[in-house]
Regions:
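Short, charged/polar surface micro-motifs in flexible loops or helix N-caps
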Residues: 30, 63-65, 83, 89-91, ...
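Conserved hydrophobic/aromatic beta-strand scaffold that supports enzyme active sites
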Residues: 22, 58, 83-85, 106
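Generic protein-terminus/edge-of-domain signal
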Residues: 1-69, 74-76
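Conserved beta-strand positions that form and line the central face of beta-propeller blades
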Residues: 22, 93, 128-129
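Short acidic-glycine-tyrosine-enriched beta hairpin
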Residues: 72-87
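Tight coil/turn sites that cap or link beta-strands
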Residues: 42-45, 80-81, 89, 99
Length: 131
């Protein structure tokens, strides 16, 4: 099951200092291919190669066990109840373990307000996991 909404930003949105770019959720059964080929081409990735994106994304795992890794964070286990933050232009990869179910929710966003939080150390690439 999948539901994704990619939001078209207009110049007025940027005046708020924070714009939503995408929101959605996906559910996978054990051994399902991940990610779904239905991903938008700008977001699809091979978990063995990883990717970079142009905005922040907060991902919330509500079911399952998997692995997360980024350029600034070594490989670590992620599980139900955890969230992780993806940073713009920061290489990352994540995926469920093959034998695990997986439910993930996410919201993507960008803007000067969140950039300032990162610049002032409130959020850090080296500490992207929350539980």
């Amino acid at each position: 099951m999948k539901s994704v909404k990619y939001i078209v930003e207009n110049p007025r949105d940027a005046l708020w200092g924070l714009s939503i770019t995408t929101v959605g959720y996906e559910c996978y059964k054990a051994n399902d291919p991940y990610p779904s080929k239905e991903h938008n081409s700008g977001y699809y990735f091979d978990p063995d190669k990883g990717r970079t994106i142009q905005e922040y994304q907060l991902c919330y795992i509500t079911e399952g066990v998997g692995t997360f890794k980024s350029a600034s964070c070594p490989s670590c286990e992620i599980r139900s109840g955890m969230m992780f933050l993806l940073f713009p232009n920061e290489w990352h990869t994540f995926s469920p373990h093959k034998n695990s179910t997986w439910k993930q929710y996410w919201i993507g966003f960008k803007g000067i307000n969140i950039d300032l939080r990162a610049e002032n150390g409130f959020i850090k690439k080296e500490k992207p996991l929350f539980n």
